[in-house]
Amino acid sequence: MKVLVAVLVFALLMCMFVDIAESRRRDNPEYPSGLRYDEEMGVFKRCAQTGGTCSKSKDCCIVTAICSTATSPKTCFYG
């Protein structure tokens, strides 16, 4: 019975820790609005609902977005 209680307390503490970490990341003033963090690439990406421009190829937020290298500033196309 003591083991079960210990496991439940541990699980609760882990859930609280993860929730606190997530809320800190969302509320962090260094986390600019209009950008999202791409964990795979380790960079902030500019978000746009439709269209928009990007200064670098990795600035497009939506996964299906492709930045044209022919135009300057590059144009984001969403597929």
From Swiss-Prot:
InterPro entries: Conotoxin (IPR004214). One of its GO terms (molecular function) is toxin activity. The keyword Repeat does not apply. Residues 1-23 form the signal peptide. Keywords: Acetylcholine receptor inhibiting toxin, Amidation, Cleavage on pair of basic residues, Disulfide bond, Knottin, Nematocyst, Neurotoxin, Postsynaptic neurotoxin, Secreted, Signal, Toxin. Its main location: secreted. It is found in: Secreted; Nematocyst. Disulfide bonds join C47-C61, C54-C67, C60-C76. The presence of a 'disulfide through disulfide knot' structurally defines this protein as a knottin. Negative results: does not show activity on rat TRPV1, human TRPV3, rat TRPA1 channels, the human ghrelin receptor, human neurotensin receptor 1, rat ASIC1a and ASIC3 channels. Alpha-toxins act on postsynaptic membranes, they bind to the nicotinic acetylcholine receptors (nAChR) and thus inhibit them. This toxin very weakly competes with alpha-bungarotoxin for binding to orthosteric sites on muscle-type T.carlifornicus (IC(50)=14.95 uM) and human alpha-7/CHRNA7 nAChRs (IC(50)>45 uM). This is Alpha-actitoxin-Ms11a-4. It comes from Metridium senile.
